[in-house]
Amino acid sequence: VAASGINFAIIRVGYRGSASGALIQDPNFKKNISGATKAGIKVGLYFFTQAVNEAEAVEEASMAMSLASGYKVTYPIFIDTESASSGRANGLSKSARTVVVKAFCQTIRNGGYKAGVYASKSWYANQLNASALNGYCIWVAQYNSSCTYSGKYDMWQYSSKGSVSGIKGNVDMNISYTGY
């Protein structure tokens, strides 16, 4: 993977069950982070949220930090907020979702890590109060030849259909404008 020119990876650390609300460690997390760090690839993490309140967001952030301990995490720990099939958080208002995201990010920051938010361009416009997220790393997903998000952003996910030698299947492709 490193030989393909990949110099950073954002690895899923875990997620909250869409229906049950249970916290689940990604079954490939340890293998993925160990492989990336062994290859000299800088890593960040993301947690796929289905938190419906601040307390659940703090639980998610705490789990992510607990699993991150012992690894060199130089990129942010992101909260991934998007719609899920029958997702328990799908019906949150824009303001309630923003409160959840801020609680996650502040917990991550209080734990000594960089904090960030991952969402699509339309999600930032319609489901989050993006102006309330200043100070956190903003990672925008927009599968296009250029990112047209008008707000400040630090990373851009431009494809979900990338190919990287050493990884089976499609890979999300990203550009980081900050070195971390």
Regions found by a protein language model. Give the residues of each.
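Structural recognition of alpha->loop->beta junctions
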Residues: M65-I79, S83, Q127-K152
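Flexible, glycine-rich phosphate/dinucleotide-binding loops
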Residues: G17-S18, V52, Y124, C147, ...
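Short beta-strand/turn micro-motifs composed of small residues
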Residues: F47, A119, Q142
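Functionally critical loop-and-helix segments that line ligand-binding/catalytic clefts
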Residues: A3, S131-Y180
